Regions:
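Glycine-rich, often proline-containing surface loops adjacent to acidic residues and nearby aromatics
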Residues: 7-9, 36-41, 79-86, 219-223
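A cross-domain feature marking catalytic cores of carbohydrate-active enzymes
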Residues: 12-16, 40-44, 85-87, 118-120, ...
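Generic structural signal for well-ordered alpha-helices
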Residues: 24-28, 56-64, 106, 206-209
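Substrate-binding cleft of extracellular glycoside hydrolase catalytic domains
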Residues: 32-66
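Extended, histidine- and acidic-residue-enriched regions that form the cofactor-binding/catalytic faces
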Residues: 220-233
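Active-site-adjacent pocket scaffolds in enzyme catalytic domains
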Residues: 71-219
Length: 233
């Protein structure tokens, strides 16, 4: 347990299109014991704003009614959720338009109760944003893709702006781990059996100093894994 008495916790971003009640029941049991929370993950392709709304609303209903998940916003009374986009293609950010299709996705997510997106970083994918190692607000242009490519940093004492908060994980070049002994590998905060959290990786995570502006002593280190793959459990 930590100084506040909490267990280590994991955010389980479960894919809507792969729903299996017995899997969610087991994750729900872990969450009820204080080991994490359930959030929303989605893979889709050639979709529309209305199609996205239908998928998210249906899955929110399942998570809420059958698994006791998703907190309520005390101000609005609306259910809230965190989000990770499958294939990293948030807001139709792939140049070829695959694995999304919704240019106003950021607005739709905010409308449905999404409090923050946790998709990034995505490098070396071409969905990677220009803005890195940041916690910021993205303002959607409903007629263009990848509106989260830039944004306004979240800052202490400054009201929220834009449409959706984007919480990024560390992204850097690891000069201590080189491909062919020459080219530095991309550190994209992915943890798995084949990419273990070594000391040099953890040092890089800390050095990126992801924080809310005005509060530099609180560092946010968001790492991720495809935890349903048996070798990575």
């Amino acid at each position: 347990r930590d100084a506040d008495g909490f267990h280590p916790q994991h955010s389980f971003f479960y894919p809507e299109e792969e729903y299996e009640v017995h899997h969610l029941d087991q994750l729900q049991a872990l969450c009820e014991k204080g080991f994490g929370e359930l959030e929303v993950h989605l893979h889709h392709d050639n979709d529309t704003a209305d199609g996205l709304r239908e998928k998210i609303r249906r899955f929110m209903g399942i998570l809420t009614q059958q698994h006791g998940a998703l907190p309520i916003n005390k101000r609005t009374g609306q259910r809230m959720f965190g989000f990770i986009h499958g294939n990293w293609a948030l807001d139709n950010s792939r140049p070829d338009g695959r694995w999304c299709g919704v240019n106003d996705e950021i607005q739709v997510l905010a409308e449905l109760g999404c409090y923050a997106d946790f998709t990034l970083p995505s490098a070396p994918s071409d969905t990677q944003t220009a803005k890195i190692n940041s916690i910021y607000y993205a303002t959607d242009d409903p007629h263009k893709p990848c509106s989260h490519n830039h944004g306004v940093d979240v800052a202490v004492g400054v009201p929220a702006s834009g449409d959706l908060m984007i919480v990024q994980g560390p992204l850097a070049l690891n000069w201590r781990n080189r491909k062919w002994g020459l080219v530095p590998r991309i550190e994209n905060s992915d943890v798995r059996a084949s990419n273990q959290p070594t000391r040099d990786r953890v040092d890089l995570w800390v050095q990126q100093h992801i924080h809310v502006q005005g509060k530099p002593d609180w560092i946010f280190i968001k790492v991720h894994t495809h935890g349903a793959q048996e070798t990575d459990m």
